[in-house]
A protein has these predicted regions:
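Active-site-proximal helix/loop segments of hydrolytic enzymes
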Residues: 4, 27-138
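Short, surface-exposed beta-strand segments enriched in small/polar/acidic residues
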Residues: 4-20
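Glycine- and acidic-residue-enriched helix-capping/strand-helix junction motifs
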Residues: 16-32
Length: 138
């Protein structure tokens, strides 16, 4: 089994860098997703550390706190949960935008395919797969 760090990628809602708002509040919903991802991975027998920042701080402060927590563990992968606000589907089209995993290093592709498989086996959310972005700023 593998060992992972997982975190919701923003500060709590209304406290500093709390992510996208509009149809939903990213910092609220990404914590729900993060908790479910952790539950699913643990159910598969993996060791998972929750490295979420729950403090009121800036974007850089949040990132620094997350990195410090993640660096406390020797893991096979670090996962940051974010929600893409690009659809702007205020009226609804009865379709989910889906979930994708963006990687910047091919070495993690096999592990992340397994991660996505576990997530989607237990979900109705569309699987948008693993995508490569060497300039990933996530």
């Amino acid at each position: 089994m593998a060992t992972y760090n997982v975190h919701a990628g923003h500060c709590p809602q209304g406290q500093g860098a709390s992510g996208a708002v509009g149809i939903l509040q990213e910092s609220v919903e990404d914590r729900i997703v993060k908790d479910e991802v952790i539950r699913l991975l643990r159910a598969e027998g993996h060791t998972v550390y929750d490295c979420t920042c729950d403090e009121n701080t800036t974007k850089q402060g949040c990132l620094n706190k997350i990195v410090a927590k993640c660096n406390q563990h020797g893991v096979d992968g670090d996962y940051s949960i974010h929600l893409n606000s690009g659809r702007n589907d205020y009226h609804g089209d009865n379709s989910t935008g889906g979930v994708e995993v963006i990687i910047y290093d091919d070495a993690m592709k096999k592990v992340l395919k397994e991660f996505v498989r576990i997530l989607h086996r237990n979900s109705v959310i569309r699987n948008r797969g693993v995508k490569y972005d060497k300039d990933c700023s996530c």
